[in-house]
């Protein structure tokens, strides 16, 4: 039974090797001429320049319009900092939290084992 399985596995392996060796790889795009004089296919060469310029101006206008809409928006994030005294209080609170979380910030200094 094991000889039969071994023969079958060997035959299958031989078949796979023959199938792989007979397959030819597809040529690289730069190697195939494809009727383009050996230069390969370039998608940008077929797009007219006026179309590209039109697309660029349209995208430019869209970006400028989006930036202006963002600058003129009434709904900005200010965390209440522009509301007088309460905004100043909030700013001081946030600065204190940032200082407390900073490694060299206020508070008791921790000594390392080498300083003792």
Swiss-Prot record:
Signal peptide stretch: 1-25
GO cellular component, one term: cytoplasm
Location of this chain's protein in the cell: Secreted
InterPro entries, sorted: DH2-like (IPR034439)
Residues with Proline amide modification: 106
Keywords assigned by UniProt, alphabetized: Amidation, Cleavage on pair of basic residues, Hormone, Secreted, Signal
Residue ranges the record assigns to the propeptide: 26-75, 112-116
GO molecular function: diuretic hormone activity; G protein-coupled receptor binding
Gene Ontology biological-process entries: adenylate cyclase-activating G protein-coupled receptor signaling pathway; body fluid secretion; courtship behavior; G protein-coupled receptor signaling pathway; negative regulation of feeding behavior; positive regulation of circadian sleep/wake cycle, wakefulness; response to temperature stimulus
Domain of life: Eukaryota
Stated family: Belongs to the diuretic hormone class 2 family.
Function as written in the Swiss-Prot or TrEMBL entry: Regulation of fluid secretion. Stimulates Malpighian tubules fluid secretion by activating the apical membrane V-ATPase via cyclic AMP of principal cells in the main secretory segment.
Protein name: Diuretic hormone class 2
Organism of provenance: Drosophila melanogaster (Fruit fly)
Biological classification of the source: Eukaryota, Metazoa, Ecdysozoa, Arthropoda, Hexapoda
